């Protein structure tokens, strides 16, 4: 029979040891604004920490446009800033933009280096604005970004065989910055889908540009567990064939991310070493608003490594609609599927690089369930 006093002493000792162990874990371990990037290219070049080490007086909460702009412009210490987004923020403050120039002045949000922006409520969202990351070491997590709607699209008769309408501003532009992590962010046309815009000059009047673009020498970028929904031209990595200085830069990882009813550019790549793994693409070539055209655009000197992605696209069966030829000549895929069948592509697989970071990809048949459960804002 156990001596009661011995049993009590044993329990007490266990409790003390447990308390000591718990005391070695930071009290803020569950605070997502204190995280650094853990996957993909953003872990390289010294890693991506954002404002995770910000001093207490450099941590802001923003629930409206004025508070967000103040937090972005504030002078902060050497360890940067954290901005917590609560609820839906309308950058226009209820006053509709009248011109592209008006939108540029009132809608642009420049993100300083060493900044973490994180949604802390289930409905955290930025509307009627567009974000620029042009400085190093930025983290954006757990928010919805409604893609900006340009009130003044321009007609270009030389765009394509019949001309096209083009607009300005992406939901997020990463331009010339090193080390950016975009995690659990949802990008969507939201309240203004393309079927509401009508036509002119015989073509749909397009008020949207991109959702998320990476350009002008940006480098070491990871987009993880995010969601792109209902958009035409989604992601551009590399802005011009003539910008040859981008070669050796534009290192981007996109993984475990949803592409739902995305027509094209998921992503379209020039020059970059781009790793695309465990992404879930779902759509249809006959969708009434966002018909699928292609996913991965092979542009000039692009070096795409596609790995264990799952494509569920009604109306396609082969690689020609997965990897679109836009001047590239190499493309490596391993383990991806199209409507449950192994993807086979005719391109040279000699992309000339392998990921320098560790990762453990799922099999393609596990991707849909994982992405549906975990990708996008509100799922951290």
Curated annotation (Swiss-Prot):
Keywords: Calcium, Lyase, Metal-binding, Secreted, Signal. This is Pectate lyase. It comes from the Bacteria. Residues 1-28 form the signal peptide. The active site is at residue 265. Its EC number is 4.2.2.2. Its cofactor is Ca(2+). One of its GO terms (cellular component) is extracellular region. The keyword Nuclease does not apply.
């Amino acid at each position: 029979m156990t001596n009661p006093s011995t049993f009590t002493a044993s329990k007490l000792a266990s409790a003390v040891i447990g308390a000591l162990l718990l005391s070695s874990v930071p009290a803020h371990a569950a605070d997502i604004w204190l995280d650094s990037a853990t996957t993909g290219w953003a872990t390289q070049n010294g890693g991506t920490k954002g404002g995770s080490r910000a001093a207490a007086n450099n941590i802001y909460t923003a629930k409206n446009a004025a508070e967000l702009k103040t937090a972005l412009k504030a002078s902060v210490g050497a360890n940067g800033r954290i901005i917590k987004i609560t609820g839906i923020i309308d950058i226009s403050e209820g006053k509709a933009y009248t011109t592209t120039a008006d939108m540029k002045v009132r809608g642009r949000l420049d993100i300083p280096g060493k900044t973490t922006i994180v949604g802390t409520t289930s409905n955290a969202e930025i509307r009627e604005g567009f974000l620029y990351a042009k400085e190093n070491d930025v983290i954006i997590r757990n928010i919805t970004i409604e893609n900006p709607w340009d009130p003044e699209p321009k007609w270009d008769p030389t765009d394509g065989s019949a001309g096209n309408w083009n607009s300005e501003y992406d939901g997020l532009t990463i331009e010339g910055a090193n080390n950016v992590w975009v995690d659990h962010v949802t990008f969507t046309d939201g309240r203004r889908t393309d079927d509401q815009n009508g036509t002119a000059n015989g073509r749909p009047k397009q008020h949207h540009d991109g959702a998320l673009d990476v350009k002008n020498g940006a480098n070491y970028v990871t987009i993880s567990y995010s969601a792109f929904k209902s958009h035409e031209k989604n992601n551009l990595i590399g802005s011009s064939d003539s910008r040859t200085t981008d070669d050796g830069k534009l290192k981007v990882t996109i993984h475990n991310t949803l592409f739902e009813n995305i027509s094209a550019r998921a992503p379209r790549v020039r020059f970059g070493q781009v790793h695309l793994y465990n992404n879930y693409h779902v759509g249809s070539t006959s969708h009434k608003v966002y018909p699928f055209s292609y996913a991965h655009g092979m542009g000039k000197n692009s070096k795409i490594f596609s790995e264990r992605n799952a494509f569920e696209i009604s109306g396609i069966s082969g690689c020609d609609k997965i990897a679109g030829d836009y001047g590239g000549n190499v493309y490596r895929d391993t383990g991806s599927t199209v409507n449950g069948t192994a993807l086979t592509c005719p391109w040279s697989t000699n992309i000339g690089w392998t990921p320098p970071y560790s990762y453990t990809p799922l099999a393609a048949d596990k991707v849909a369930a994982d992405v549906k459960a975990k990708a996008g804002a509100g799922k951290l």
